[in-house]
Amino acid sequence: MTHTYPVAEIFTSINGEGVLAGQLAVFVRFVGCNLRCSYCDTMWANAPDAPHRKMTAEQIAHEILDTGIHNVTLTGGEPLLQPHIHELLARLSEHPQLRMEIETNGSMDLSPYLDLPRITFTMDCKLPSSGMFEHMRTENFSLLRPCDTVKFVAGSRTDLDCAWNVTQEHQLLGRCHVYLSPVFGAIDPADMVEYMKERGWNGATLQLQMHKFIWDPNARGV
């Protein structure tokens, strides 16, 4: 049986954040999400009935390969909600030039995908202002590897306190990349720098969402 995936959009741009910020990537955005974060900037893609194309793994792979771009970011929505996502990842892994990044919201089990080559996770850890902190799957922290990233999107000092505590409790700085990002327009990045200085937060990286400064913050497909 050939499975299909609900794809909201496939586009090429630069990575706006994370370890590969500024590098070209092909983005594959799936519809549907199990969380409703207060600051979500892709709410339009969260509903299962959001506009989308039904695409097979072969069609998705073909469209990616046609771009000639090697970095591939699977995003959403929540890509790991797709019932047959392992099949798609395995198909993409057949191409050694592709490097896959899965942007996931922190509530989904990562363990089924650790056996696949050239796949990294950028896992959100939702903070109190998101309204979704209680949905975080803390078991995932022990699965993360040096190639993976935990991203904290903070909108307040309370959020930063929470991010600091999670980082210390789960010893994340010795395990994976740790990135801090402001909720766009909600907190002054300068205040985040001051907080990092107060804590002596070695090893964490503050990063702004580059694409929101290059293009309109609400623009799609960039």
Task: Tell me what each language-model feature is.
Residues 27, 73, 149-151:
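Short aromatic/hydrophobic contact patches that present stacked aromatics
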